[in-house]
């Protein structure tokens, strides 16, 4: 089996990015500012279980975030509407196991294969960092910044309440998806995803030259 495609949405500058992974690919290179680091940071956070921060949420989506949370706190929209309107940070992994023997034990991939059709040879996994489906919890966190003595009076620093509580308002959910029927999903554990994709980042070592300047080449 092999990882054949990665899709990332709403992570920093990666609003809607897709990477096709060739079967012979062992190294990804590219020019500066082409989002290589951003790509692997996103993957690393998901696989390590590191929560996303507010800084990871795209600048272009923040006004929508602020406006809809304010509308919810003002009781202009329902929590269900808020939940649907806030776009999550998401990453999809498409795994191809077409070359594996049907009788083989697919091991760590097995929990993510939910279509029992023998003609299906791909597994689709999506992780979403989205608003918690807990209206009371969200309201309790934000209420002090939007209400005073029972009156809707948003504080001047109301945005800071969202920023500082981002990890309390949002959570990660991992789905196994039927590639032939995207409406059919199962929620999976982070441990299952981590076992499927062992992931380790080796940081580039930057050496300081004798003249005090940085040598940006990788050390051997």
Q: What is the predicted function of each stretch?
A:
Residues 1-49, 54-69:
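Pre-Walker A-like glycine/lysine-rich segment at the N-terminus of P-loop NTPase domains
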Residues 58-88, 92-220:
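Glycine-rich phosphate-binding loops of NTPases
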